[in-house]
Amino acid sequence: MKNTDLTNTYRELDRELAILHDQLESHRSFENILFLPTPEKIRSVREKWNDLKTQVENLDAPDNVYRLVKHHLNDFLDSLKFTIEEKEHNPEAPLLDFVYYLQEIARCDRRSNEIRLDVLTRKLQAFHENQDLILNLIHTQYGENEASLSSAFARARLDMQRDQKLLNEYFPDFTEEQ
């Protein structure tokens, strides 16, 4: 295999790993899709992860640069494995993390206000549309220990109440209707 072909193979695998990461974290092209750790989705992402792991393991690494990049890809696979496990065992995370998502969109995202508001609206709509599934996943994961989440949700509620007061600061161009 020519090094150009090998380099392209590395690039494609890097891209596929990034896409899987984006899917798990609901980033970029997946930002309007809420990743909910149903057994089917977890199975699907684990299959994808296993496929990518096999492809990375089978990569040629003819010199130190390729070995370094291959090592990086393996490290990234390890982090994705951890992310998959965290998503599976913490179905409440999207709800608890929303306050951080709001702050990221409000403070760090440099897209137009209209786009940022649209992204936030879609995310909230996805929570609303999937609330029964989310609650079922939480109940399935925690069962009788659901009460252990109460302090985390109470904190998240306080954070959201604080940020609700800052919405005018975050989005100064918006009207109440928006």
Stretch-by-stretch model annotation:
Residues M1-Q178:
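N-terminal maturation segment of proteins
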